[in-house]
A protein has these predicted regions:
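Active-site mouth loops of central-metabolism enzymes
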Residues: 2-22, 99-103, 151-152, 156-157
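Acidic-and-aromatic substrate-binding clefts and catalytic sites of carbohydrate-active enzymes
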Residues: 14-16, 44-46, 181
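Catalytic cores of alpha/beta
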Residues: 24, 63-78, 104-117, 144-179
Length: 185
């Protein structure tokens, strides 16, 4: 099975206006063809406007909104990415027909999020302000214990790191910086 790729936006890299987001994301999608994309912007007071633009960007990807089940349903997103504090919304999101990815940072959280379609597990490598990396051995161990599809996340910025996480049996890799730093954007 081909490793799935999951592009997560950050306003510092992809822009915080509709125009800059659309341009940067369109170029990254054209270059990398990610399987999934997520609009993540925890600080914007224009998230709905950005989400409307985000969901219209062409490509073969499946588009998720971060943290807002109701908006994802209203705007017709493919799914929603829930934080580790939002596991109580997994069932509601699934009932609404959304594909659900949940953020996890421990074995206990991964177990608690087992109703999600997939999880991110992080940080695998060093990532700014994300604490001590879990490392590849920990990732390999968790993929052996958890039946939920796992996206490795955190500090994945090179093709070599993607190959390393692939050997751990993950469903895919997720990254913010990989899609921006390895692109002609």
């Amino acid at each position: 099975m081909m490793l799935k790729s999951y592009l997560i936006t950050d306003p510092k890299l992809f822009g915080d206006t509709a125009e800059t987001l659309e341009r940067a994301l369109s170029l990254a999608i054209a270059e990398h063809s990610p399987d999934f994309i997520c609009l993540r912007d925890k600080s914007s007071n224009r998230y709905t406007e950005l989400a409307e633009v985000f969901l219209k960007i062409p490509g073969r990807h499946k588009a998720l909104l971060h943290g807002d089940v109701d908006l994802a349903v209203t705007l017709g997103a493919y799914g929603v990415h829930l934080s580790s504090l939002q596991f109580d919304q997994i069932a509601r999101a699934k009932e609404a027909g959304l594909y659900v990815i949940a953020s996890t940072h421990s074995y206990e959280e991964a177990l608690a999020a087992n109703e999600a379609d997939a999880i991110t597990y992080s940080p695998i490598f060093h990532s700014p302000n994300k604490g001590i990396p879990k490392g590849l051995e920990d990732l390999k161990e968790i993929t052996g214990k958890i039946n939920t599809k796992i996206f490795a996340l955190g500090g994945i910025t090179t093709k070599e790191q993607i190959q390393q996480v692939e050997t751990c049996g993950v469903y895919g890799f997720a990254s913010i910086r990989y899609f921006k730093e390895n692109s002609n954007v």
